[in-house]
């Protein structure tokens, strides 16, 4: 295993009122200020969100530097516009509204999908890993399917929503699943079969365009990469780096397995759905589903198994120590959802959750 693929990361953030914590429609103002600071922010579907994107990097050290710089710049731009930047999967407090961003494409999506679009103030994280071609991206997608619930559990960061504990570590993933092309990707035998499926969804009007293929793994339409989209936006930079490193390890392992002709684990749809539900419900604080044996197992054990399964790739990329230390920290202290609940349970005061999320967003080590 000698080829170490490059990677890049996109993070979505929520803009909230610094006092009430309610989402605010200021993405254009924040993006304009960030542009003055030489950082390009993308506008998302709702006008209370912005997205950052790193450059293509070779290693996780440079990735971390970029992520921290982008979060700090976006936060400063938000503050200048009268908002606060939060790395949360969902707004912890009641939104005043989720107005759709005023572009032709987003207006059309708002009209087509109604409340699904207008309740879309949710934030995820997308990792792009370089692959040889689109057929390789599809092969990787097929092989990543059993690991997606674990990656969701690891990054869960949306336990508190509308001033209440949702009972789920990732309520974002539950809301996200309402889109017709969201969730785990189907198994495809080739890129041609994938393209035929996308064409069918588009031709029947189920999706507006190829950009609305929201499966949790997909070949990028714009880059020679496979894109893994299963995560809530992690609470901290270090958790994002951990997620990205583990995703790259999974992609490298999948490519190696494909080269060797190793069989793909067959997955019944009900089993994968069950594992997703457990991941969204429990995050890292409880059981997940062992999809090889169809039995419950502690998420910490399943993450340990995944680390060993991907160890050759992680070591080749120089990320094994980072991943093992990061997983130990998350297992011991919890992830974003754990932090949200810990803050909420102190006084059942959403201000505590907002303060915790704001601190985590810019946490450095």
Swiss-Prot record:
Its EC number is 6.3.2.2. It comes from Mycolicibacterium vanbaalenii (strain DSM 7251 / JCM 13017 / BCRC 16820 / KCTC 9966 / NRRL B-24157 / PYR-1). Belongs to the glutamate--cysteine ligase type 2 family. YbdK subfamily. GO terms for molecular function: ATP binding; glutamate-cysteine ligase activity. This is Putative glutamate--cysteine ligase 2-2. NCBIfam families: gshA_cyan_rel (TIGR02050), PRK13517.1-1 (NF010041). ATP-dependent carboxylate-amine ligase which exhibits weak glutamate--cysteine ligase activity. It catalyses: L-cysteine + L-glutamate + ATP = gamma-L-glutamyl-L-cysteine + ADP + phosphate + H(+). The lineage of its organism: Bacteria, Bacillati, Actinomycetota, Actinomycetes, Mycobacteriales. Keywords: ATP-binding, Ligase, Nucleotide-binding. One of its GO terms (biological process) is modified amino acid biosynthetic process. Pfam families: GCS2.
């Amino acid at each position: 295993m000698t080829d170490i693929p490059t990677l890049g990361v996109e993070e979505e953030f929520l803009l909230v009122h610094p006092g009430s914590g309610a989402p605010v429609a200021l993405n254009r103002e924040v993006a304009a200020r960030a542009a003055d600071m030489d950082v390009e922010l993308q506008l998302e579907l709702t006008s209370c969100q912005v997205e950052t994107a790193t450059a293509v990097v070779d290693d996780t050290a440079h990735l971390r530097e970029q992520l921290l710089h982008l979060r700090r710049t976006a936060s400063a731009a938000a503050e200048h516009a009268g908002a606060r930047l939060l790395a949360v999967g969902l707004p912890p407090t009641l939104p005043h509204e989720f107005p759709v961003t005023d572009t032709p494409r987003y207006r059309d999506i708002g009209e087509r999908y109604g409340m699904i679009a207008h309740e879309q103030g949710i934030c995820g994280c997308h990792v792009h890993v370089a692959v040889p071609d689109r057929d390789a991206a599809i092969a990787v997608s097929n092989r990543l399917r059993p690991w997606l619930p674990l990656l969701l559990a690891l990054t869960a960061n949306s336990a508190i929503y509308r001033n209440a504990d949702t009972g789920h570590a990732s309520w974002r993933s539950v809301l996200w699943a309402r889109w017709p092309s969201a969730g785990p990707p189907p198994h495809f035998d080739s890129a041609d079969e994938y393209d035929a499926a996308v064409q069918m969804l588009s031709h029947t009007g189920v999706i507006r365009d190829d950009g609305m293929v929201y499966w949790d793994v997909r070949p990028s339409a714009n880059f020679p990469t496979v894109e893994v989209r299963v995560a809530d936006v992690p609470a901290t930079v270090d958790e994002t780096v951990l997620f990205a490193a583990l995703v790259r390890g999974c992609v490298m392992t999948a490519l190696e397995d494909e080269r060797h002709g190793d069989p793909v684990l067959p997955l019944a749809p009900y089993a994968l759905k069950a594992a997703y539900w457990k991941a969204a419900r429990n995050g890292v604080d409880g059981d997940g589903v062992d999809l090889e044996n169809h039995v419950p197992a502690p998420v910490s054990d399943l993450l340990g198994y995944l680390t060993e399964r991907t160890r050759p790739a992680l070591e080749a990329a120089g990320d094994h120590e980072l991943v093992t230390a990061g997983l130990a920290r998350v297992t011991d202290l919890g992830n974003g959802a754990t932090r949200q609940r810990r803050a909420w349970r102190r006084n059942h005061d959403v201000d505590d959750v907002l303060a915790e999320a704001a601190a985590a967003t810019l946490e450095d080590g």
